[in-house]
C-alpha cells in the first residue's frame, strides 16, 4: 500500500499512527497531522512513525463512475450509507491489516499502534476494532459511519473490545449526518461489545475538522499510547 510515510524524529521508533483519508483524497491530504502532533507535544511523539496510506483508484458508481481514490465503491448516495461495495470494504480492511503487520514486523508493539481515519477512512478504522487479530492502542474516527454491520458482526473476534475509540463528529455535517455517527457508536457498543467508545459532537462543524477536535484527538492518542 503506497502513500506518505513520516519517520520518527528519533530512532528507534516505538509507536505508529496509521491514518486513512476520505473519498477523493490522498494520504498527503492528512500529512499535516504528523507535524501538528510533533510540534504540539514533541516529547510524546518524537519516537512515532506516521503512515498515511493512499486508497486505490476506483470508479465510484454514485459519482457517475468517476475515477478517484476510494477505499470502497459507493453504489448509491442513500441516507444510511449502506449501499456500498462490501467486498471492496473488506479488501481495504485486509490491506490495513497488512500495514499494521508491517509495523509489528519492524518492532512496534501492537499496543503502541493507533489506527485513525476520516469519513470513508473512519468507517474502516472503526471496523478494525472488530477484525484485527492484534489488540492495538486505540482507534480514531473523524466523521465516521458504519456501512456493513451485518458482515462485521460475522467477523467480530473480541480482541479489541477494550481498545479505546475516539469518534468526533460535527453536528452540521451534510455528507455524513451526525445521526450516522450516533448509529455507528450504538452498533459498535451494542452489537460488537466495544467498552470504551467516546463520541464527541462539535457544534457548527461540517464535514471537516476543527482545532478543538484536533486538540481532543491529540490528547486521546497521547493517553492511549502511554497507558
Curated annotation (Swiss-Prot):
Signal peptide: none annotated. GO terms for cellular component: cytoplasm; nucleus. GO terms for biological process: fatty acid metabolic process. It is found in: Cytoplasm; Nucleus. Gene3D superfamilies: alpha/beta hydrolase. Keywords: Cytoplasm, Fatty acid metabolism, Hydrolase, Lipid metabolism, Nucleus, Serine esterase. SUPFAM superfamilies: alpha/beta-Hydrolases. Present with 1480 molecules/cell in log phase SD medium. Belongs to the AB hydrolase superfamily. AB hydrolase 2 family. Hydrolyzes fatty acids from S-acylated cysteine residues in proteins with a strong preference for palmitoylated G-alpha proteins over other acyl substrates. Mediates the deacylation of G-alpha proteins such as GPA1 in vivo, but has weak or no activity toward palmitoylated Ras proteins. Has weak lysophospholipase activity in vitro; however such activity may not exist in vivo. This is Acyl-protein thioesterase 1. It comes from Saccharomyces cerevisiae (strain ATCC 204508 / S288c) (Baker's yeast).
Amino acid at each position: 500500500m503506497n502513500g506518505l510515510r513520516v519517520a520518527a524524529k528519533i530512532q528507534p521508533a516505538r509507536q505508529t499512527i496509521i491514518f486513512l483519508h476520505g473519498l477523493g483524497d490522498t494520504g498527503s491530504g492528512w500529512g499535516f497531522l504528523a507535524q501538528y502532533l510533533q510540534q504540539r507535544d514533541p516529547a510524546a511523539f518524537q519516537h512515532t512513525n506516521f503512515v498515511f496510506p493512499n486508497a486505490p483508484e476506483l470508479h465510484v458508481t454514485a459519482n457517475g463512475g468517476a475515477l478517484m481514490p476510494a477505499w470502497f465503491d459507493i453504489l448509491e448516495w442513500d441516507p444510511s450509507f449502506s449501499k456500498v461495495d462490501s467486498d471492496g470494504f473488506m479488501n481495504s480492511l485486509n490491506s490495513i491489516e497488512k500495514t499494521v503487520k508491517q509495523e509489528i514486523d519492524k518492532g512496534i508493539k501492537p499496543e503502541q499502534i493507533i489506527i485513525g481515519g476520516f469519513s470513508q477512512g473512519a468507517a474502516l478504522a472503526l471496523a478494525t476494532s472488530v477484525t484485527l487479530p492484534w489488540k492495538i492502542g486505540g482507534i480514531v474516527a473523524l466523521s465516521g459511519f458504519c456501512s456493513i454491520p451485518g458482515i462485521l458482526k460475522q467477523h467480530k473476534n473480541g480482541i479489541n473490545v477494550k481498545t479505546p475509540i475516539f469518534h468526533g463528529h460535527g453536528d452540521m455535517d451534510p455528507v455524513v449526518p451526525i445521526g450516522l455517527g450516533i448509529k455507528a457508536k450504538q452498533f459498535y457498543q451494542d452489537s460488537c461489545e466495544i467498552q470504551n467508545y467516546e463520541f464527541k459532537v462539535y457544534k457548527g462543524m461540517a464535514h471537516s475538522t476543527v482545532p478543538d477536535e484536533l486538540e481532543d484527538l491529540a490528547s486521546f492518542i497521547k493517553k492511549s499510547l502511554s497507558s
